[in-house]
């Protein structure tokens, strides 16, 4: 599997943004005699402390599995909130069924068990996108709920810019709650 996040993390620790002597240049951008990754740096930031701790590259699969698992936990918390605030008749068995369908019936299980550069980025970004939804998706939103949601989506954008539309959710809810008549 392609792994650019370990080399990016190593470069970050050296104060660089480019990848020094990449083993393969597939998907990289060549600019000014240097190689750069076209996607966000967010996943590499999680490799830095692990590399410092272990003194070596970390298998990307471990990061992917961790973030995929954490994403399922946050999705479970969203489902509990949906049950308590919107659908009180929703049974516990229904909640677990929806969670199982999310975890194993979507591409989440596939993407979350692979460790290539694309999958690591998607799982890290997914977690922060799901966190953003968790902070803002509630029946009685308060002004203080918007900041952690917007920050979570902002962090997610550092991983994959493809969630840019999802990042508009806090703004939509703010307009719905405070601007619209």
Q: At which residue positions do the language-model features occur?
A:
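Transmembrane signal-anchor helices characteristic of membrane glycosylation enzymes that use polyprenol
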Residues: 1-4, 11, 102-108
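Extracytosolic helix-loop segments that constitute the early lumenal/periplasmic catalytic or substrate-binding loops
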Residues: 5-35, 42, 136
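Short hydrophobic/aromatic helix or loop-helix immediately within or flanking a transmembrane segment
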Residues: 27-55, 123
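Transmembrane-helix motifs of polytopic, lipid-linked glycan transferases
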Residues: 56-88, 131
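Transmembrane-helix signature of polytopic, membrane-embedded enzymes
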Residues: 75-107, 127, 140-148, 178
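Specific aromatic-rich, kink-prone transmembrane helix
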Residues: 100, 123-141, 153, 167-170
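Membrane-interface micro-motifs in multi-pass membrane enzymes
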Residues: 104-129
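Perimembrane helix-loop-helix junctions
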Residues: 166-181
